[in-house]
Amino acid sequence: MKHTNQQGVAVIMVLLIVAIATTLATYIAQQQSLWQRQVESQFDRAQTRYLGTAGINWARAVLADDGASSQTDHAKEMWTLRLPAIPVENGEVIGAIEDRQGLFNLNNIVRNGASSAPDVAQFQRLLELLGLPPHLAPALADWIDEDTEPHPGGAEDGYYLALARPYRTANRPLTELGELVRVKDFDASIVARLQPFVSVLPKTTKINVNFAPPEVLAAVIKNMSLTDARTLVHKRTETPFTDVADFTNALKQFGALQPVVNDLTVNSQYFWVTGHARVGQAQVTTQALLYRLNNWPIIVWRSVQ
């Protein structure tokens, strides 16, 4: 009987050892598979980030080549074409370059630290064309300018410090469009309405008349109607303007308009680059603001998500 019991214990021990060994082997295999997937995932993520950076450098090279060969930027140039999905190993990459100087630069309304009345008036006209209250313009000017005296309809520190969650005015140029929600009477819906027509650029810029939408043209050219601006944009689609003089000549058909030619250009320096890369299950979206200086664009701002 004792011998039988010993045999039974031995069998149980063998079964236990086999079970442990089997479980351990399964665990090791699972861990190896998990480790392999993690390594592959990390590699894929690293590769997508690399492709995102490569996309920005591609855009810089394209814009540098364009700047070296032409002093006029318009929608018929090759760089405006969206990069189609290019296959890469186990994935793809897509990219696009957009002009940023056809939009109204919100930072233009303050120059050398002081509110610029002509630019504030232009922004007010744009607001009215978009069905938004014009007093948003002086409110933004007060947010950006360096003084503490509020404009009519605007607000300085006294207004913001009285809020439930007080803060002060920035007294500096905007750094991003989303900052507008901190300005008196702006909200997310107003920002969304403005987004297709405005930019936030670090320097004072001119409007590229070859890219400006009708609303922006009607805002920066006093007494120009939106209907006439749309007619001009239709003409531009067929034949881009070669220089500012070409543009002002085209304005003559609409009467005695007097644009401020120093505010206009046909050459852009700021561009927005968007890229999307996918490798395996990893995806990354890259955005960058480029400034073309002496033909070779520098990166002003970049985001990788």
Model-derived segments and spans:
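Compositionally biased linear targeting/interaction segments
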Residues: 2-305
